Amino acid sequence: MAMENQVLTPHVYWAQRHRELYLRVELSDVQNPAISTTENVLHFKAQGHGAKGDNVYEFHLEFLDLVKPEPVYKLTQRQVNITVQKKVSQWWERLTKQEKRPLFLAPDFDRWLDESDAEMELRAKEEERLNKLRLESEGSPETLTNLRKGYLFMYNLVQFLGFSWIFVNLTVRFCILGKESFYDTFHTVADMMYFCQMLAVVETINAAIGVTTSPVLPSLIQLLGRNFILFIIFGTMEEMQNKAVVFFVFYLWSAIEIFRYSFYMLTCIDMDWEVLTWLRYTLWIPLYPLGCLAEAVSVVQSIPIFNETGRFSFTLPYPVKIKVRFSFFLQIYLIMIFLGLYINFRHLYKQRRRRYGQKKKKIH
């Protein structure tokens, strides 16, 4: 009898955009769902298989602000996906009106990953419109938006030219010298690569201070990962600078960036070249894993050199007195490379699917 009177609640995961709320209800084989909204409250009740077996599950969520009626939902074999439109397009500091989060509610980290480039463009356009209205009301003849666009255009142009120089240089030398060009790649283009990677710090700063709408974390991870390879693995070890792997690392990095920076450059002047957009969202599929593989090979090749030279190794103080080799940290870094590959590959795939996936169908 106690089980019959008990209200069972499923696990619910949530995320948001400026205009929408996303809820993922962990119920499989759902039947007879009753999903509705009244002002700022979502009502859910359905028969399905959850944590307590096959039962009727229900919950009510009082949102932080008003939402539109008639939520859109989609049933899959494993879950229920619900999309709720906000009444006013804005970012909420939390989902529910009450500050304490319900026990059955948790963030949907897959959805909370960085917004796609298309969503960033929409946010940038909205911010541009608001800035323009504000500046016009103040009677200012100039707009901060134009200055921001000009600054970002020049930044992306400089990076595009730098990586293009590296890419063309390596391509021409390979066509002329063949495999012989592999072994002096570092001494030929390292200065330009140093310049481009140091300038990439600005990209992370731009995201951190709000000049761009890009998320900070992905930019920071790529910056630290590449600079570790460039400055530590290649820069401090002369024995690594004449290895063929340097060519492949630099070539793959530059191949990725010439399309990325050219895409961002055209976005700054409100141009949309469909061919370039397709390349920007597609070429990463082979290039990104190959780039990570080349980085991993460079780390593996450097391990015996660091062991032999003892560089960056240290001995723990008394009473432990254990020598810690730098190669130990390199082995950990190898695991991090492939973990990062998995996370970023999944995220980039979702970006591409959101850009080129099938149009959403409203399912009642």
Swiss-Prot record:
Domain CS, residue spans: 7-96
GO BP annotations listed: fatty acid elongation; sphingolipid biosynthetic process; very long-chain fatty acid biosynthetic process
TM ranges: 152-172, 192-212, 215-235, 245-265, 283-303, 325-345
Cytoplasmic side: 1-151, 213-214, 266-282, 346-364
Active-site annotation: 288, 295
Keyword annotations of the record: Coiled coil, Endoplasmic reticulum, Fatty acid biosynthesis, Fatty acid metabolism, Lipid biosynthesis, Lipid metabolism, Lyase, Membrane, Phosphoprotein, Transmembrane, Transmembrane helix
GO MF annotation: an example: very-long-chain (3R)-3-hydroxyacyl-CoA dehydratase activity
Coiled-coil annotated residue ranges, if any: 113-138
GO cellular component, one term: endoplasmic reticulum
Side of membrane Lumenal, spans: 173-191, 236-244, 304-324
Leading EC class: lyase
Residue list for modification Phosphoserine: 116, 137
Subcellular location: Endoplasmic reticulum membrane
Record-listed Phosphothreonine modification sites: 9
Subunit details: May interact with enzymes of the ELO family (including ELOVL1); with those enzymes that mediate condensation, the first of the four steps of the reaction cycle responsible for fatty acids elongation, may be part of a larger fatty acids elongase complex. Interacts with RAC1.
PANTHER family: VERY-LONG-CHAIN (3R)-3-HYDROXYACYL-COA DEHYDRATASE (PTHR11035), VERY-LONG-CHAIN (3R)-3-HYDROXYACYL-COA DEHYDRATASE 3 (PTHR11035:SF20)
Protein family per UniProt: Belongs to the very long-chain fatty acids dehydratase HACD family.
General function of this protein: Catalyzes the third of the four reactions of the long-chain fatty acids elongation cycle. This endoplasmic reticulum-bound enzymatic process, allows the addition of two carbons to the chain of long- and very long-chain fatty acids/VLCFAs per cycle. This enzyme catalyzes the dehydration of the 3-hydroxyacyl-CoA intermediate into trans-2,3-enoyl-CoA, within each cycle of fatty acid elongation. Thereby, it participates in the production of VLCFAs of different chain lengths that are involved in multiple biological processes as precursors of membrane lipids and lipid mediators.
Protein name as annotated: Very-long-chain (3R)-3-hydroxyacyl-CoA dehydratase 3
Annotated organism of origin: Pongo abelii (Sumatran orangutan)
